[in-house]
């Protein structure tokens, strides 16, 4: 008997179902169902993907939704809603939007809201969560009958069904009788959330994760009820209710939804005076052309503009361009900095004269066809950059312009990633945290990592998994839940604008700001035909804006970064030295190396290096550099290639060059050339053959030799995957150049602004401040009277602000600034009496003192000792002023400071690190500068010019990894007074020294300087010794206790001696013989080099508790 599954939750009922839509549809198809429903709870996330998957598989999609209907404050019931038609589908979208846009945490639709959209829907009162079953369980049969009759009266007698589930006849039969009595059709179902029974354990885990409980704490009635049943299983389970089975098919037959997918729904722009969009766009372009070019506007340029406009009009995109022009105009008028362009749109002259982009495509030989190809109808893709702190303003403007119901941001899903799935599964199963932590530490957090990949790559992970049954269970279940959606998030850039209310095509939900989110990802948005625009928040534009503002305020220079000279020697000198921290796209170690080798001296060099510095084309960077230097002869397969490739020294760098070659040599239009480029880049055999034939035939027709044409085609094929979009490269290189110019000419302003963008990232901030010092820019300490919220410039240097200090909030800083503006602060007592103690608390005051911000009020130890008394004094002052209504000023003599011993330099530094996260006024190593001279120690800065070095520094971070061979090695982040570096400790050296390494301690290291994969300098360590052992002559001794049992075994004693000799080194060994009560220091030949390997092997021989390393003072 044919039936249909009508109660199905997919993965989009978050953390409730194991049913991924492709597998769900495949399972239903394989089980020979003719139709399938989707009824996710409250949401329509999966409607379009489900519809597409069903259509592709030949299944009829039944689109529904499960929700809670609230009839009154104390009465509600779950209902299953199904779209009978496209109108019904639209009603589901609207109802889901109402539910998901509620302010309350509870999700429901009111009865009145449901009535507003009741038409074209079918309704099922579900077995679980339905009011009827609750009434039956409470023996309130009449209430249940009245409820059903109420629904029939208001929703339509033929539109309401009653659901039964499960095999318990005692629970199902009363519902059957009730249905018969009220003449309401009965339907039977599985509440499907699991496709395979073996996935039930994983299903329980995600329920536990969602509820925040342990699996063993879950209360599940009939777990079989959530499993996917075949047609036969459904027939067997509900054989007593054949009509209920048939009714599922009848319900499905009543549903007819046909979605229109892939058809663009272009929004309309309201033009003035009822002009057509085409006429208005043309008028704006003509005005913009005059502004951009003035007297330089020529017939050729006008022809290019006309051709572009003709394509835009023919493709129906005039409104689109006007919409983008309008909000870019708003951004300019609101003084919001905009990026020069992004992607292929920079190749459009229309975009340039409309001030959408700031890259002249004619000057840089950019192609419009790379953006909009008349030979290939596709939607335009204009991505726009704004400062990250002002992006929201533009989106809000768009919302107000087109209506709150026509603009939305795009949703994304956060999924259970590899490492997170292990942790969540482990927690749900109550596995000991240390077991889970060991496993998860071995799983890389890099993007794209999966548990299968991690398991295959990491031998240590495999060992841990196989070490226990519980570890294997965790891994098995984690692999099943991995990748399931866990929560919703907002796409970093995507915004949709619709001509019609969005809820006619897609459901919405609450977003983070004023603009809602689509209930569908980017793919779904495109499927339903909505036009996406990317509004990107770019931190580098924020930095640019900040630097320009500081330059104006500090130097009185009003810079227009869009009019900077592109041949500035100072800028290119900075780039040639690779000093590009903070410079967009040029910051990485590898890029700095390339810049140092290339020594760019034209803007075109920056564009080329931006295009080439990627996996694949990087191999051609040496060719480009040698061609530029003239150390390698540049050859061309044909002289006609020279005009196209000479600017890149014979290397095909850009996709546009491929298009130009095809146009020049094969007679292709630029649109056809773009199709060739796209086809070749996919590297599909048949397409490659077809394109080769077309290219060679065209080239021969143009008068080229067939053999030459074939060779040139082969060249194109070789570079097709490597070629970069030149329009994008030029646009982003423009921003890079602007930042480099500002850094070269206004370094203090640049560094102050850059530091202000990373004030809450201590590690990055510390490195940046060290670089500033190396560049000769003084970093002035925090100061109550001079510091601001962010970094500020002074004549002597850049002033450290108050915001990075621990516990110091913006409110507290404003309170402090207000106090100092009223009058100079005389003392700690004076300061406490003039600020609000609820905002500037004793904890805030302590942080200020420890960081040195209150040094102008006294010595740090003294100030710390007087905090409590200062706040008590402040209370007395404020109490008097309150009692007198502020009519009198209290003239009370401030108490004397409690006198204490001043802090030592090392104590000051320790307090600074506590308050700021790193050392501000110096480095602990400075105290040992003289003592270290005898060891030929170099500073890090001196060491960068040498190969073999001896350095001293503090270890800030220790990172331990396991190699592919399973050996352990480490990476140390170290610093001295001149900079920070990474030290690499390979397995053999690590085994010797790991035991003595601690974060926050000073060490003496020997090794060789080398450039790693990122081209950053790093130290390959040969030796690492604690500094205190070297300078204080503090030495270590190894103590071994030989018990009576061990002493009896001569062979074991011989093993100990052999082991000591194998690990010969400087550390003395002392043996205590328990039976004889005798202590003996072994001769020098038994002295050892301490390592984990040695200690572990000794523990095996004499017992862990009988191996002790201790320190002693060497008097010699």
Curated annotation (Swiss-Prot):
It catalyses: DNA(n) + a 2'-deoxyribonucleoside 5'-triphosphate = DNA(n+1) + diphosphate. It is found in: Cytoplasm. It comes from the Bacteria. One of its GO terms (cellular component) is cytoplasm. Transmembrane segments: none annotated. One of its GO terms (biological process) is DNA replication. Its EC number is 2.7.7.7. It holds the Pfam family DNA_pol3_alpha. SUPFAM superfamilies: PHP domain-like. Keywords: Cytoplasm, DNA replication, DNA-directed DNA polymerase, Nucleotidyltransferase, Transferase. The keyword Zinc does not apply. GO terms for molecular function: 3'-5' exonuclease activity; DNA-directed DNA polymerase activity; nucleic acid binding. InterPro entries: DNA_pol3_alpha_NTPase_dom, DNA_pol3_alpha_thumb_dom, DNA_pol3_finger, DnaE2/DnaE/PolC, DNAPol_HHH, NA-bd_OB_tRNA, PHP_dom, Pol/His_phosphatase_N. DNA polymerase III is a complex, multichain enzyme responsible for most of the replicative synthesis in bacteria. This DNA polymerase also exhibits 3' to 5' exonuclease activity. The alpha chain is the DNA polymerase. DNA polymerase III contains a core (composed of alpha, epsilon and theta chains) that associates with a tau subunit. This core dimerizes to form the PolIII' complex. PolIII' associates with the gamma complex (composed of gamma, delta, delta', psi and chi chains) and with the beta chain to form the complete DNA polymerase III complex. Belongs to the DNA polymerase type-C family. DnaE subfamily. This is DNA polymerase III subunit alpha. It comes from Halalkalibacterium halodurans (strain ATCC BAA-125 / DSM 18197 / FERM 7344 / JCM 9153 / C-125). The lineage of its organism: Bacteria, Bacillati, Bacillota, Bacilli, Bacillales.
